[in-house]
């Protein structure tokens, strides 16, 4: 809401615009009239001439708007504080308004301070609440019963409980025994081949001895 002086200025601007609009309507929409009875009435096909009834109604409407606006201006002028009021009364009223303004400013400062205090209290409560939750979670995670539960879970995880785990363990044992058997067979084959080679070498020595014994020089 604006003050009365601003309202008065706006009303003066509006009434000036209405005066200009009225003059423009009269200039653009009036009919042609001769200066005397001897001159013929002139016409212009490009002009936007209003009929006598339209012209009269337009003038009435524009005049009514101007009258209403002038009454508003008069009312605002009569309501101005300087009209019919002495200088002492005006100064007293100004002092009273200044005191009210100071009181309102103090209330504003007090409300802002109270708001800041409430915000700080809320922040402290949130900090305490979050810290309590964190401490409770930390204490729960470090409790002895929880450690024992974790160990039990690990032991249960190491022992196969499902049929698939048991079958997998049996298959692994079979594979290990098969690999061990193949390794032993390879060792046995190597020892047999070494024995056969030694027998062949011994047979060759015997053959040499026999050939020497039956040589022509000894016969």
UniProtKB/Swiss-Prot annotation:
<feature type="compositionally biased region" description="Polar residues">
    <location>
        <begin position="210"/>
        <end position="219"/>
    </location>
</feature>
<dbReference type="GO" id="GO:0016592">
    <property type="term" value="C:mediator complex"/>
</dbReference>
<comment type="subunit">
    <text>Component of the Mediator complex.</text>
</comment>
<dbReference type="GO" id="GO:0006357">
    <property type="term" value="P:regulation of transcription by RNA polymerase II"/>
</dbReference>
<comment type="similarity">
    <text>Belongs to the Mediator complex subunit 21 family.</text>
</comment>
<feature type="compositionally biased region" description="Basic and acidic residues">
    <location>
        <begin position="166"/>
        <end position="181"/>
    </location>
</feature>
<keyword id="KW-0175">Coiled coil</keyword>
<keyword id="KW-0539">Nucleus</keyword>
<feature type="coiled-coil region">
    <location>
        <begin position="86"/>
        <end position="125"/>
    </location>
</feature>
<keyword id="KW-0805">Transcription regulation</keyword>
<dbReference type="InterPro" id="IPR037212">
    <property type="entry name" value="Med7/Med21-like"/>
</dbReference>
<keyword id="KW-0010">Activator</keyword>
<feature type="region of interest" description="Disordered">
    <location>
        <begin position="141"/>
        <end position="219"/>
    </location>
</feature>
<feature type="compositionally biased region" description="Basic and acidic residues">
    <location>
        <begin position="191"/>
        <end position="204"/>
    </location>
</feature>
<dbReference type="GO" id="GO:0003712">
    <property type="term" value="F:transcription coregulator activity"/>
</dbReference>
<dbReference type="Pfam" id="PF11221">
    <property type="entry name" value="Med21"/>
</dbReference>
<comment type="function">
    <text>Component of the Mediator complex, a coactivator involved in the regulated transcription of nearly all RNA polymerase II-dependent genes. Mediator functions as a bridge to convey information from gene-specific regulatory proteins to the basal RNA polymerase II transcription machinery. Mediator is recruited to promoters by direct interactions with regulatory proteins and serves as a scaffold for the assembly of a functional preinitiation complex with RNA polymerase II and the general transcription factors.</text>
</comment>
<dbReference type="InterPro" id="IPR021384">
    <property type="entry name" value="Mediator_Med21"/>
</dbReference>
<keyword id="KW-0804">Transcription</keyword>
<protein>
    <recommendedName>
        <fullName>Mediator of RNA polymerase II transcription subunit 21</fullName>
    </recommendedName>
</protein>
């Amino acid at each position: 809401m604006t003050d009365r002086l601003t309202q008065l200025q706006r009303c003066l601007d509006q009434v000036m615009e209405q005066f200009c609009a009225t003059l423009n309507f009269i200039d653009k929409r009036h009919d042609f009239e001769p200066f005397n009875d001897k001159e013929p009435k002139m016409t212009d096909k490009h002009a936007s001439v209003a009929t006598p009834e339209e012209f009269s109604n337009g003038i009435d409407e524009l005049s009514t708007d101007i009258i209403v606006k002038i009454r508003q201006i008069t009312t605002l002028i009569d309501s101005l504080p300087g009209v019919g009021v002495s200088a002492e009364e005006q100064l007293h009223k100004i002092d009273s308004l200044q005191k009210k303004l100071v009181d309102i400013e103090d209330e504003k400062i007090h409300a802002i301070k109270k708001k800041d205090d409430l915000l700080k209290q809320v922040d402290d409560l949130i900090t305490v609440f979050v810290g309590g939750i964190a401490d409770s979670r930390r204490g729960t995670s470090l409790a002895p019963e929880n450690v024992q539960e974790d160990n039990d879970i690990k032991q249960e995880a190491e022992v196969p409980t499902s049929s698939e785990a048991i079958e997998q363990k049996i298959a692994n044992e079979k594979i290990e025994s098969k690999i061990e058997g193949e390794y032993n067979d390879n060792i046995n084959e190597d020892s047999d081949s070494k024995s056969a080679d030694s027998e062949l070498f011994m047979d060759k020595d015997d053959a040499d001895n026999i050939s020497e014994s039956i040589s022509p020089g000894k016969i």
